[in-house]
Amino acid sequence: MKRCLIICLLLVQYIFVQAQTAKITFENTLSKTGEVGFYLPGPPKSSFQLFGDSAEGNYFFKDGILKQDIHVKELTPIYYYAGKLRGYLYVSPGDDLHVKFSRIGDKDSVTITGKGANNNQYLGLTTSLNREAFKNDTLPDRVLAEIKKMDLQNQVAIQRYIKKHKPTKAWKDMMALNQKYTPLDLFVGFSGNQKFSYRNKKNYRELKAVWDKKQDSLLNAVDIQDTKAVKSEVFYSFLSDYLLRKKESLWEQMKDSTVMQKYYPGMTREEALKMHSSDSENQFVERMINQEFQGKVNELAYASLLNNIQRDKKTNAAAIIDRFEKKYPDSEYLKVFAPMISEVRTNEARKLNDKMIFIPGGTEFSNFDQVLEKVKGKTVLIDLWGSWCGPCHQEIQKNAGPLKKHFADKDVTFMYIANYDEGKDEQLKKLIAYYNMEGLHINANRTLTDDILKKTGASGFPSYIIIKKDGSYELSKAGYPMKRDELIKQIEESL
């Protein structure tokens, strides 16, 4: 009897696991080799949880066949790419899809059959704007008309698809959610960038007010607190863009006492300005999230913030994670970001060491010659960075360690010059320890920054300058994102 019960339990467990698994077979008749890569759009998901042990990297064909199990609890969008062939798959538990790459006529094509194929035929939605066509527009009328036109065309395409292919209710619900938020997503994404094309005009504030009013009307037309929306990749795209653009807009309004009190309640003006100056990015976005969103949408907005922290700036990362864990102890996103959270905990525990050297009087330097004098007779790589600069954080995380490892037994000095970070010495020290930025450090004043940019020809951040032993210097040719091998070659030629 006991043995029978165990067998029944194992059988139930097997059936449950199978029901949570979708099978996809890719057949490549164009080539026996090659690879398929996957991207998970929408709310952050764990590729390891979906794909298992082989989650990292791409997946390779063997004799033209690739079989992949995907673990899903509900209809999940997955974007695949294989050479020039790419598209969305909407995968449900129990699906058994066959995706065939072949030549039909004079074109490479994709044919999808099998269980779940009714959710995965060609849909033909228009999901992006031709930004070039509107690049000189200072008012939103034309782009709004185009968005409305696209929306109507997409609605027709979806209804045509439903009639022809009979997709599942879950697919129809997902498409309805995506369509509901697409106009808002397109407008917020476009208008946020478009302001840079007219910000030098005398009537900038009046123009921006027109764009803001149109955006508000789109926001009022939908419910951005809808808990159902958290499953939509389009809503997540909107939410991430909205947080970015709202943050930028509020930066321009921080002198307004009403705005300041909303986001820094209970503080004096001086306290609020100090708090805002210390972290106008991660911590400020967290304040926005808690002011603007509730429930599941608040949790999703936190996930967007954690995703940005994972990608670039780690300022106040541990404190934000602590608050998120306390607020949502059972959140699925804690599993998604577990590797990043572990890394943050480890790095936050680091302290400054004697190899992290702050040049005495460096904050008072007014010209690049004073910097050169301090490193006279040395080969030096200068990293121009800033605590506020996302790409700087990305490049330090990616390249600082490998560069130091490469030149470990060679006479190369590493120097980090922070820019536009006056008054943020304590914040800089935390980041320097966090990223283990061993080397020489200067927190430049504006005069020094301007002189360095003028003399070296650097035009932005991050930038890299190589100083030779004879005191001459040159700008890195490695570009951005950094071509590390190119920079290594340039430094070695300077030794």
Regions found by a protein language model. Name each.
Residues 437, 447-490:
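Thiol/disulfide oxidoreductase modules built on the thioredoxin-like
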Residues 103-373:
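Oxidative protein folding and maturation machinery
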Residues 409-425, 436-448:
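Thiol-based oxidoreductase modules, predominantly thioredoxin-like and allied folds used
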Residues 1-24, 386, 494-495:
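Bacterial Sec-dependent N-terminal signal peptides
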Residues 379-380, 462:
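Alpha/beta-hydrolase fold active-site loops
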Residues 20-170:
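A non-transmembrane, solvent-exposed segment enriched in polar/low-complexity residues
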Residues 376-378, 409, 437, 458:
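Active-site acidic short loop of glycosyltransferases
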Residues 384-402, 419:
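Conserved redox-active cysteine motifs that mediate thiol-disulfide chemistry
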